[in-house]
């Protein structure tokens, strides 16, 4: 999509993402095209491609581009997956998942954010996305199992419903830790036993709280 932000998008990919080690060509190509500035308030459009998160209202944020790329890369998407996203937020991460997977199911607890994200995603033609308003820590049982699950808010621990809804061999990426700083963790389910998991620490991060039954209390 050619627009006045095209050069900023390409610079973002080169200096913030490729330069920091995310080299997946599908991610780089998609992030070179997705108009991130449409997912923030118009007054912040000129800051959309900077290396930092931005407020999107309701005390929520759009993550910095590098973190979006890093988390997406950890999901190891090939193009045919069914993906669950917890925390639609602005819809930018959702759009990237829609570019890289076959089906995306996204849950957002704040109705105004969910509705705005749906509007933008429809405007951009992402029709392989379903959005539901509710408590994302329960997952989306009727659509499970999922090949990959991405959580875009910090949890005190791994919500067990998400492990239960993950395919064997499926990947779950989420921030786990305190309310102000977390570790970004990749969890791979190894068998039918929901306790048989491989966990990898991808580094420190800061996310808003995951609010819900299996997260933080509101």
UniProtKB/Swiss-Prot annotation:
Keyword ATP-binding on entry: no
Gene3D superfamilies: Vaccinia Virus protein VP39
EC class of the enzyme, as a word: transferase
Keyword Methyltransferase: yes
PROSITE patterns: PCMT (PS01279)
Localization per record: Cytoplasm
Residue numbers annotated as active site: 63
One of the GO biological process terms: methylation
Pfam families reported in the protein's UniProt record: PCMT
Any GO MF annotation of the entry: protein-L-isoaspartate (D-aspartate) O-methyltransferase activity
GO cellular component: cytoplasm
Function of the protein: Catalyzes the methyl esterification of L-isoaspartyl residues in peptides and proteins that result from spontaneous decomposition of normal L-aspartyl and L-asparaginyl residues. It plays a role in the repair and/or degradation of damaged proteins.
Family of the protein in this entry: Belongs to the methyltransferase superfamily. L-isoaspartyl/D-aspartyl protein methyltransferase family.
HAMAP family: PIMT (MF_00090)
The protein's name: Protein-L-isoaspartate O-methyltransferase
Organism: Syntrophus aciditrophicus (strain SB)
């Amino acid at each position: 999509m050619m627009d006045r932000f095209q050069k900023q998008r390409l610079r973002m990919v080169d200096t913030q993402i490729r330069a920091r080690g995310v080299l997946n060509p599908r991610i780089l190509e998609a992030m070179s095209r997705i108009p991130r500035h449409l997912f923030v308030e118009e007054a912040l459009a000129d800051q959309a491609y900077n290396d930092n998160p931005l407020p999107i209202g309701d005390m929520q944020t759009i993550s910095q581009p590098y973190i979006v790329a890093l988390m997406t890369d950890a999901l190891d998407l090939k193009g045919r997956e069914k993906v669950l996203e917890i925390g639609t937020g602005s819809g930018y991460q959702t759009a990237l998942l829609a570019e890289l997977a076959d089906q995306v199911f996204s849950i957002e607890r704040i109705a105004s954010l969910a509705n705005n994200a749906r509007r933008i995603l429809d405007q951009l033609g992402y029709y392989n996305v379903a959005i539901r308003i509710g408590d994302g820590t329960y997952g989306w049982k009727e659509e499970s199992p999922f090949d990959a699950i991405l959580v875009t808010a910090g949890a005190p621990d791994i919500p067990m419903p998400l492990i239960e809804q993950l395919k064997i061999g499926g990947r779950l990426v989420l921030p786990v830790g305190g309310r102000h700083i977390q570790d970004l963790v990749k969890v791979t389910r190894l068998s039918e036993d929901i306790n048989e998991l491989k966990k990898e620490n991808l580094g420190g991060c800061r996310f808003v709280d995951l609010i819900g039954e299996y997260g933080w209390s509101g």
